């Protein structure tokens, strides 16, 4: 059992034998499949995206018409200047002014359409991110416990923060960039052909060279972008873990080990990020070099054609501008491909999470939990976190309504695992657990868990006031009921001594109250919830002896008339239990009340006596 729990712990840290961390060299998943899922996901915004495409195309059309129209003004200015020199005419400034006003109108319309499509696309992107975060949040609440025990918290949080942000930025920039780039490429090509097919052919020669270079860089960088996103999640997990446990790290002088462990992960992230960013940064210089070669060839051929009188000076000016505009969308596409890859890597991780197996929350004909009186039967229960390793081998017990049941045994005996099975955090491999004759699998999970109140060894309080944290047990409770619950848990006295009393704000990890006070607040929360069945997992292990005695009295009053399961290593706290189940290696080896088990002089008696021998020693 101890080995099994160690595996689970390492899985939770994300670096154990079954950790999810992606290793360097692992092949990336299908890029086309990821983009296909993303396109399918944003299908609800199809109308808005079509409008964006129309406005982006319109903006590009107005922008593309400008250079050729402006070239007419250059031609008119050149011809007028030559006529004035020769004495045969003058410069027609009226005609040139009309052309300039027309070009100004084109560019104003282009800017307006570009602004509108940008405004719409930003709204669409944020709605998609909002919807995706909402679905991830809902998904988290439907995930089985085993998922979270095999991953770091930071890795899960990275799906909601880093991955969704990366996806949103990619969508916002890539879609409009691709549309405008393609429209510009097609429009410029048409305008270039209308000026000179020969010069167009010279300019187009650079296109296959550009595409070949882009394909090469994309193929090389795709793997590193996926690694970068993956290990960013691991970094987040380690930072969260170190921050949460910094006192333990300092107490055991493990700063050096922690830093070394972080540096190893950070080195992998650095290598993947460096390579991906280096390769992506190579695209623009390469494309600019190829574009300049094409620009020089076009300028040379245009000069020769102008000498022959085939084209005008204004056409050369317009064509040179089009050559610049022709290479620009290719460069933009090269840049946006980097964003598309990051976006695809992020969407791959998000959809991978959204497609994870969920818990079955409801059943077709659920049993009525409101009729439960507290009878619990464990019938030959067998369970293992892994199918090939059974840790609960043959657990059977009958619990009557209102009984106080203590589950004791050495560390790793399976005590806490039984509680997880009872609340269906996991399902048994074989056998059954029944409440009032109904298998726990016949209840809806949410309703089943409403029947239980829990006080865990690891207390958990939320950021908020003390009043809000206690009221979490029953949200509709009045202030008077909250205070009454605090008094029953013997928490009222210390709460009133705190600055702000019940309105004192707890920070994120509730470090502004002591561990014992945290325990009292969680007990008050359970008292307020007033559940039919109670589970106390090491409930008083973090409280001093004097406080433990007072809490024990309050808990005895609370448990009267309710079925209660108590897990405790300090056997002195459960001597008044109606039934004590003694577990060893996943089996019930003894059961009975305290006096009966001592008379047997068996495993329980050895445990009980050894604790007091340790105290005397």
Per-range role (PLM):
Residues 17-19, 36-39, 47-72, 103, ...:
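Alpha-helical segments in transporter systems
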Residues 362-363, 369-617:
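ABC-type nucleotide-binding domain
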């Amino acid at each position: 059992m101890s080995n099994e729990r160690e595996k689970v712990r390492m899985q939770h840290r994300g670096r154990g034998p079954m950790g999810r961390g992606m290793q360097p060299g692992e092949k990336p998943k299908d890029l086309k499949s990821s983009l296909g899922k993303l396109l399918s996901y944003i299908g609800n915004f199809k109308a808005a995206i079509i409008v964006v495409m129309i406005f982006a195309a319109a903006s590009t059309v107005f922008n593309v018409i400008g250079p050729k129209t402006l070239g007419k003004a250059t031609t008119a200015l050149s011809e007028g200047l030559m006529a004035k020199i020769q004495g045969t005419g003058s410069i027609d400034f009226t005609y040139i002014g009309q052309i300039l006003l027309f070009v100004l109108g084109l560019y104003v319309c282009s800017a307006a359409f570009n602004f509108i499509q940008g405004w719409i696309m930003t709204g669409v992107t944020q709605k998609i991110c909002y919807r995706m975060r909402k679905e991830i949040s809902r998904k988290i609440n439907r995930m089985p416990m085993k998922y979270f025990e095999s991953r770091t918290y930071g890795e899960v949080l990275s799906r909601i923060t880093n991955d969704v942000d990366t996806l949103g930025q990619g969508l916002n920039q890539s879609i409009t960039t691709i549309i405008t780039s393609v429209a510009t490429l097609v429009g410029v090509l048409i305008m270039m052909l209308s000026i000179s097919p020969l010069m167009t052919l010279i300019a187009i020669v650079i296109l296959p060279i550009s595409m070949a270079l882009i394909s090469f860089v994309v193929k090389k960088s795709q793997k590193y972008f996926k690694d970068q996103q993956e290990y960013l999640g691991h970094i987040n997990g380690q930072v969260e873990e170190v921050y949460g446990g910094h006192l333990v790290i300092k107490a055991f002088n493990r700063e050096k080990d922690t830093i070394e462990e972080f540096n190893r992960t950070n080195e992998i992230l650095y290598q993947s990020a460096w390579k991906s960013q280096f390769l992506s940064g190579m695209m623009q210089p390469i494309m600019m070099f190829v574009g300049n070669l094409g620009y020089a060839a076009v300028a040379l051929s245009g000069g020769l054609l102008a000498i022959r009188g085939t084209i005008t000076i204004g056409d050369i000016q317009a064509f040179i501008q089009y050559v610049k505009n022709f290479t620009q969308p290719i460069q933009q596409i090269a840049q946006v491909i980097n964003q598309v890859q990051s976006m695809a890597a992020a969407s791959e991780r998000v959809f991978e999470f959204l497609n994870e197996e969920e818990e079955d929350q409801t059943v077709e004909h659920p049993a009525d939990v409101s009729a439960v009186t507290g009878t619990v039967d464990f019938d030959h229960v067998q369970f293992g976190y892994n199918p090939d390793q059974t840790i609960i081998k043959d657990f059977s017990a009958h619990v009557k309504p209102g009984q106080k049941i203590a589950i004791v045994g050495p560390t790793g005996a399976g005590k806490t695992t039984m509680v997880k099975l009872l609340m269906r955090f996991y399902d048994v491999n074989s056998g059954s657990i029944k409440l009032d004759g109904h298998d726990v699998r016949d209840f809806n999970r949410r309703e089943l868990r409403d029947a239980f109140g829990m006080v865990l060894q690891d207390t958990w309080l939320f950021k908020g006031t003390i009043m809000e944290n206690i009221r979490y047990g029953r949200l509709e409770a009045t202030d008077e009921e909250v205070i009454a619950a605090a008094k029953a848990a013997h928490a009222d006295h210390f709460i009133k001594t705190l600055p702000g009393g019940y309105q004192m704000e707890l920070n994120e990890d509730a470090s502004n109250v002591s561990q014992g006070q945290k325990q009292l607040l969680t007990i008050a929360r359970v008292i307020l919830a007033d559940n039919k069945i109670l589970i106390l997992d090491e409930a008083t292990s973090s409280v001093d002896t004097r406080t433990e005695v007072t809490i024990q009295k309050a808990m005895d009053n609370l448990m009267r008339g309710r079925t209660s399961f108590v897990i405790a290593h300090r056997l002195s706290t459960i001597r008044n239990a109606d039934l004590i189940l003694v577990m060893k290696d996943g089996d019930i080896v003894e059961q009975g009340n305290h006096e009966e088990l001592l008379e047997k002089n068996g495993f329980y008696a050895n445990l009980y006596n050894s604790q007091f021998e340790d105290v005397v020693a």
